[in-house]
Amino acid sequence: SYMKKGQAIVDANHKAIDAGATAFHKFEVPADWATAEDKPHELSIEGHAAIVEQVKNLLEPINRMDGDSLPVSAFEKHVDGQWELGASQYEKRGVAVMVPHWDETKCIQCNQCSYVCPHATIRPIALTADEAAAAPENMRMIDAKGKGTDGLKFAIAVSPLDCMGCYNCVTACPKDALTMVPQEDELDQAPVWDYAVNKVSEKKELVAANVKGSQFAKPLLEFSGSCAGCAETSYARLITQVCGDRMFISNATGCSSIWGNPAATS
């Protein structure tokens, strides 16, 4: 099949194979690494007491691959299969190589980026004057547009450590206000995200049953275990914003069993 592209492409592939066999670099591993031990680390998190307990006692050990060391008693509170919701916000996996950077000078505040995000890692934020004044210095804001936004500031918050790097938001943006950049370039936005989701109030007066208005509602499905770019969790997340917490989702098993209820990472 490569021959359809020409002999030069075939030769380039052959050269790449040959280079791979000789271009490696030997790395000497220090002998003391064999007995190296991790320094004790006290996990410091805030939130609902039951979720914090679940994260500390189960989520963290399991994610460290220490699940086999957990006693049966650690699961006693979950013997009926129930887990506290919202634990996934504490994972902060940081798996995306590239994450979106928001250019406020191009943004038209359509909220389509948030609308298509499968993992709820990019969100529009409306801030009062007091909330804007207390925001981190590097939080970029513009005057909010639209009905009922007088006196409000607008921002797009991105969680660089929760983003999966799927490019959906960049593709959806009609004005090229989002560009993908290396994750490390956006790590300074993590405190901005924390402030936006934890300290800024939900503006219920802006919530409406349309693309823009729906994204001012807090998503009740976030940071799930679905694949990067998953359309299924985009729909499910949107339903939670439209219907709220008085709802059940009943469907056939499949991917939803995986992203919907991975043990300890609810």
Question: Where do the language-model regions lie?
Answer:
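Ferredoxin-type iron-sulfur electron-transfer modules and their immediate structural context
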Residues: 2-163, 170-266
